[in-house]
Amino acid sequence: MIWTAVIKGSALMTFVQGAMALVDKVFGEEILPHRIYSSGEAAQLLGMERLQVLEMVRAGTIKAKKVGDNYRILGSNLVEYMNR
């Protein structure tokens, strides 16, 4: 039973990642305010290294939420940082 949920969850995650990739292709490098980005994606959008983004997150320069061992950054927070 639990394996069925894991497999279904995995399939859902694959679908979501595919949908997000499609949105990225359609909208290009535009930062979507309601999208949640990983620190790596944020770094790519900002044209910097991931470690730089993580330093700014830890310093409070860019607002983010820690999810497990990773940070997630709302697109509107990236826009806010860029407009400073």
Swiss-Prot record:
Presence of the UniProt keyword Translocase in the record: no
A Pfam family: HTH_17
Keywords tagged on the record: Biomineralization, Magnetosome
Knockout mutant characteristics: Normal magnetic response, slightly smaller, sometime scattered magnetosomes. Deletion of approximately 80 kb of DNA, including this operon, leads to cells that are non-magnetic, lack internal membrane systems, grow poorly, have reduced mobility and take-up and accumulate iron poorly.
Source superkingdom: Bacteria
Record localization: Magnetosome
GO cellular component: magnetosome
GO MF term (any one): DNA binding
InterPro entries in UniProt: HTH_17, SinI_DNA-bd
Family under the similarity heading: Belongs to the magnetosome MamR family.
Name recorded for this polypeptide: Magnetosome protein MamR
Lineage per the UniProt record: Bacteria, Pseudomonadati, Pseudomonadota, Alphaproteobacteria, Rhodospirillales
